[in-house]
Amino acid sequence: MNHKSLFFKYVIPSIIAFALSGIYAIVDGYFVGNAIGDAGLSAINIAYPIEALIQALGTGIGMGGAVYYSINAAEKKGKRAEEFIATSWWLLVIVSVISTIIIYSFSSKILGLLGADGIILTNATDYIKIIALGAILQILGTGMMPFIRNYGNSFWSMFAMVGGFITNIVLDFIFVWIYEMGMKGAATATIAGQGVTAAIAIIYALYNKKFYVYVSLKNVKEMCGAIFRVGLAPFGLALTPNISLVFINRFSASYGGEKAIATYACVSYIICIIYLILQGVGDGSQPLMSRFYGEKDQESLRRVQRMAYIFAIILAVCGGIIMYVNRANIGGVFGASYEVSIEISKIVPIFLVSLPFVAITRIATAGFYATEKSGLSYILIFIEPVLMLIFMLVLPPLFGGQIMIWWSTVLARVFSAILAFILIKYCEKGDLQYGIQKI
């Protein structure tokens, strides 16, 4: 078996798919920023955590079911593997309906809690209400992707994302620039793009006879519990950057105002693509890790994990270099004001310090939930926003205000990576079959 070619067969399409999912937000920011300006950028930045929550629900349920599908398929338990798919499908639909009702009904109140007021609240509400109405398209679009990858066809998941991405760009141009629909146009384009992604994924599953809806009632409770146990980790992995975004926006509103929020909006659009690329390495290698774990093939598991760490760190460094070289152009891409663009150039190097550490944490987390060590992945995922909150409460009042908001995010990610290394060593000593070698 050629582990290297197998690794890249799964990982490269996954990276592209995850990168495109991050560019969805950038596309909206680009069109809205150039049409409305800083107020539009700030509105999308504040509303985005809600959209990210919707997508994270799909990712968590889909990945939770996909992990158990791969493990059971590797153990030759075909019927049980199919029931995990069916259970996940019904969970995706049910969660979609609940999400639409709650978010649409309480959108203004939720956005107010996230720090929106005035024109920003108005713009963000227009955006998020339409996103809520299309929640089922986003949840199905993100939830089906892990299954397509675990069926052994990462290319098709990439194709589905590309189809949705192109749809989003075309409709953003038409709705926001030609018909001047503003925030509502951007939101409509986003859910239409996700609808195309979901449709392509469902067509693939139906054509390949991988679309299962039957599950024995006696197994529902057990399977839902298993899916949620594993799914909480990728759910958290998708959501915690946006919990961090909420903290940054709230503290920045106090220390730096709208200018600081707009500044980080532009930075986060770009750097989150790098984060998603790193997650693409982890989730792209997950089907292989789960498969080799189910087959009890520890040597192959070690090789895949080693390649994932090395490749993720290389991508983090390369992404950081590209972002640093082009830092002066970031604000202009999103139609930011001159003052905001200057500030972006100043703070980008701060955030780039954390990229290699994020790479380590992302792969460690994926390795844990791919091999049924969800508890350890929970620790890594949720410690980051906790540390960030602590640093933001302590450092800015003592050492320099807004600049320490930026450094608090870096310190939280560095300490999270150190904890990841400790947990890996703990697994090695405890003989928990994590199987990672030194990198």
List where the protein language model places each region.
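Small-residue hotspots at the loop-to-helix junctions and early N-terminal turns
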Residues: 38-49, 124, 128, 187, ...
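Short alpha-helical transmembrane segments in multi-pass integral membrane proteins
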Residues: 1-14, 69-136, 180-232, 289-354, ...
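Short runs within selected transmembrane alpha-helices of multi-pass transporters and secretion channels
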Residues: 62, 131-149, 157-168, 186-201, ...
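Helix-terminus/linker motif at the lipid-water interface of multi-pass membrane proteins
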Residues: 23-42, 111-118, 174-181, 242-269, ...
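Small-residue-rich hydrophobic transmembrane alpha-helices
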Residues: 41-101, 138-157, 263-321, 325, ...
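Hydrophobic transmembrane alpha-helices of multi-pass small-molecule transporters
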Residues: 53-56, 100, 168-172, 197-202, ...
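Transmembrane helical elements of multi-pass membrane transporters/channels
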Residues: 9-28, 130, 141, 164, ...
